[in-house]
Amino acid sequence: MRTVGVEEEFLLVDADRSRPIPAASRALRVATEWGVAGGQVGAGALVHELQEQQLEIYTAPQVRMASLETELRAWRAAAAAAAAAVGARLVASATSPVAVEPHRVRSPRYDRMAERFGIVTDEQLTCGCHVHVAVGSTAEAVGVLDRIRVWLPALLALSANSPFWQGRDTGYASFRIQALGRWPLSGPTELFGTAAAYQELVERVLAAQVVLDQGMLYFDARASHRFPTVEIRVADVCLDVRDTVLIAALCRALVETSAARWAAGEAPPQVPAVLLRLATWHASRWGVSADLLDPMTARPLPAAEVVGRLVEHARPALRRSGDDGLVADGIARILEHGNGATWQRDVFAGSGRLDEVVSALALVTSGGA
């Protein structure tokens, strides 16, 4: 069975005022003293992200979703404890509900990004959930990328958890995706066809000397340049760990299904990237609270129907992994109660205060509610 690893990015907010604070370096020094910072390939870790108001965790590769959930909870607890030691709280929201002025982590790479991309780097404070699923070769990875691309907007809709930006309601379920769109390379991709074509594209992109390196291929899904995985990057960081595990289970099933179809010589869906951009924008705008676009036709359908088609497409793989029950329960929960964006807006409707939203987010992130 394919292994799965997850990266989650979080905000750091002041424990008293619920405002994002530049505390990552201090929290990581504490974590280093505790022996939980840094990390090696094949092991989980707590690390820096672009801004000082962020921390990132990543898990070791796991086979069982129960083990993945246990590790995610453990790393969230470790990150929350390190944050608390420096007067901060950990928040699982893909954007900051309250106004924030990001403070960039000082590193040569991030300094070069700031010099080249200006305000885009300065204002970039978003938190995603990236799922790594093992593949056997670059050829298989590209075959998978060509076949999962049509399903990624539905994953975004399920995970959407960023309705607020700089102190206002954006109207979007995932404004993180809109913010990411300011980078040169982000969002859906065209069909690649072969590993050679994928590699040629990467080489041409790097030769253009616009992005710094392969790490800046911010596609919704890509072949990882660090690990033998497909990295699915479309999802917002989820408030509820169970939703993170749901997204991970769906990602693995999509990769397994797509790899099998690639191996059998089945052609990928011939959907132009422009239609996938429409579907992604629509999922970003509405999440699961309205229609989604049909993956094959780009016609609007009820969100539950599109998500149901995703599950049906991946059902044999879900059954083989034993994740079908987990996925059914998770999707039913989100369709009934909403995603993280719904939850944030419900809290704001009850309190009228965005700092109360942040405080409530921190409580749930730390497992207190």
Swiss-Prot record:
EC number assigned by the record: 6.3.2.2
Keyword ATP-binding: yes
Reactions accelerated catalytically: L-cysteine + L-glutamate + ATP = gamma-L-glutamyl-L-cysteine + ADP + phosphate + H(+)
Keywords: ATP-binding, Ligase, Nucleotide-binding
Keyword Nucleotide-binding: yes
Highest taxon, organism lineage: Bacteria
Top-level enzyme category: ligase
One Pfam family it belongs to: GCS2
Recorded GO MF terms: ATP binding; glutamate-cysteine ligase activity
Family of this protein: Belongs to the glutamate--cysteine ligase type 2 family. YbdK subfamily.
Function: ATP-dependent carboxylate-amine ligase which exhibits weak glutamate--cysteine ligase activity.
Name of protein: Putative glutamate--cysteine ligase 2-2
Organism of this sequence: Nocardioides sp. (strain ATCC BAA-499 / JS614)
Lineage: Bacteria, Bacillati, Actinomycetota, Actinomycetes, Propionibacteriales
